[in-house]
Amino acid sequence: MNCSAQTVSTNDGVNVSLDLYGQGAHGTAVIICPGFFQSKDTVTFQRMSRALAGRFDVLAMDFRGHGKSSGLYTFSAREGADLEAVLAFARVRYQRIGVVGFSLGAAIAINTVSRHPDQVRSLIAVSAPSTFEQIEFKWWTPEAMRTGMQGLEPGAGCRPGNPLLKKARPIERAPRLAPLPILFIHGTRDVIVGVEHSRRLFAAASEPKRLEIIEGGSHAEALFRDDPQRFSDLVNEWLAQTLDPAPQSRKTERKNRKKL
């Protein structure tokens, strides 16, 4: 599996690091947006990127303040500019783009894509908070400690900025995603962002939409780490349904590629 390092710049001067898995031969890419303290460089996200690559290319990114990206993390206040820069990079290379966001990365994805729903074909929000203020991180519980310890992989970490900046609320942005297909995924044992967040977001979003509750599932990328096959199958199924072009579209895209 080919993997090449790329860097894009935001409109406010941040350099965003991303890894491109694939060769761009089939016109479809999926952007992976990790959450707070996580990085595309951890073993979990590298394995996930390789597991999802094949049918389409994968662009795994790091938000500001994470990994090799510059800047300080603002807890979803300014990270929309990071995703917009990656979307701009993808749009000149691919006809069809999907986005998979985790935790605060999912919140950023909802907030950002809702401003340009026509630029994305499919969205998956994993363990997304409906609002930043209502995240109920029960850090003192054994489950939270287990999840936190598992997340301390090499490559994880954050350079935090001001957490008090005004933030968009995904619960208010979700209705603006229409007609973009969106899949919400959440575990019932998520003690960082409770499952009710995805239930509220699902209720607020318009069709086409789907809510997948994973019984006994933990938080965000832990859903992949704990059961890679189930998570990959779920994500691949949704992306195949929403990203694969219709037969007539395939003919048009083949003609367009011949003209280039």
Residue ranges and their predicted role:
Residues 1-23:
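N-terminal cap/lid segment of alpha/beta-hydrolase-fold proteins
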Residues 36-49:
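The serine-hydrolase catalytic nucleophile loop
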Residues 49-70:
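Conserved alpha/beta-hydrolase
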Residues 66-93:
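Catalytic nucleophile-loop/oxyanion-hole region of alpha/beta-hydrolase
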Residues 114-163, 175, 180:
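Hydrolase active-site cap/lid region
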Residues 177-178, 184-186, 190:
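Short beta-strand/loop motif that positions the catalytic acidic residue
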Residues 191-197:
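Conserved alpha/beta-hydrolase "acid-adjacent" motif
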Residues 217-228:
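Catalytic histidine-centered segment of alpha/beta-hydrolase-like enzymes
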